[in-house]
Structure formats: C-alpha cells, structure tokens
C-alpha cells in the first residue's frame, strides 16, 4: 500500500489566511512534491509568485491550476522562486520582476533541482479514482479541488462530509 507519509516528504502546511490563494498554494505544493519525488529533497516554493504574477489568474480572488502551471511552464527557467526569496504575504501585490527572469531559482545548495522543469499539466479524467492513484504513484502529489459550502467553515476534525455536495467537475 502506497503512503506518502513513508517518504519523509515534509514541507510546511500553509495557511492561506484571508487571501483566496488555495490554487497557488496547491500548485506550489504539487511542484514541491514532484521535486521531492524526483530528487528526494524537501524544498519550499513560492505560492506568492503565482498570486502576484500569474496574469490569467486573479490573485487573492482565486485562480486555476491549469493557468498556474502554464505560468510556470512559460517562465524562462520553468520553475517557481523559492519561498525564502519570495515569501507568502496573505495579500496580492505587484509582481516582483525578478521572479519573471531566468535563474530566479537559487537552489545553489541543491544543484540537482536546476534539472527540474515544469513543462505543463494535464487534467485527469473526472471521477476516476484509479487515474488519480496512478498519477500519485508515478508523478507525486497532484492538485485537487473541492467546492466549498458554508458547512466547511464549521468543520473542526475528522472526515468532512457535505450532504449538499453535488458530484460535478469544478
């Protein structure tokens, strides 16, 4: 049985605060997981870069996984800046021009990471758990989304079940 907890993958859990940046945090987390999957090194990438710079998205007003991956794939270095160089602020600001330039990923202490490139993304078939399991095993963490209803704001622990949930693609 496959369990990510057995692989010592341990980047921090992020709190998006009042900024609707779940899409950016999720994409940065997926790339961190894929970097770990291929290099066995924990790194922290910048979701703030996506919030500020991914022009097809809406910063703290929301965004989409596909356009966030497209932003990363179209950068000269095809990667996100490290969290240490472009910290999360819980608000949208002007894009840091340095993040758009090549070689912004200063992982000099981890040279293998320069070999990693995000070349795009693909959407998994809707409502197909086997495809999701296969992607997790082959590629590492993948972004997923849920529709948030008012019930979720009252959630405190355990398995969340929303009785008003509709099974449609987001």
Question: Where do the PLM segments sit?
Answer:
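Catalytic-core signature of thiol
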Residues: 1-170
């Amino acid at each position: 049985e496959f369990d990510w907890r057995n692989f010592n993958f341990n980047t921090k859990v992020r709190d998006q605060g009042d900024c609707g940046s779940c899409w950016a945090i999720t994409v940065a987390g997926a790339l961190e997981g894929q970097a770990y999957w291929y290099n066995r090194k924990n790194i922290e990438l910048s979701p703030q870069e996506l919030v500020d710079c991914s022009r097809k998205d809406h910063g703290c007003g929301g965004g989409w996984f596909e356009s966030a991956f497209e932003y990363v794939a179209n950068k000269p270095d095809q990667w996100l800046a490290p969290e240490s160089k472009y910290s999360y602020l819980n608000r949208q600001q002007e894009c840091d021009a340095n993040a758009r330039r090549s070689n912004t990923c200063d992982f000099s202490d981890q040279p293998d990471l320069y070999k990693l490139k995000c070349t795009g993304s693909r959407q998994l078939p809707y409502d197909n758990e086997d495809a999701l399991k296969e992607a997790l095993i082959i590629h590492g963490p993948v972004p997923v989304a849920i529709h948030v209803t008012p019930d979720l704001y009252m959630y405190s622990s355990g398995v969340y079940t929303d009785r008003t949930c509709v099974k449609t693609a987001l």
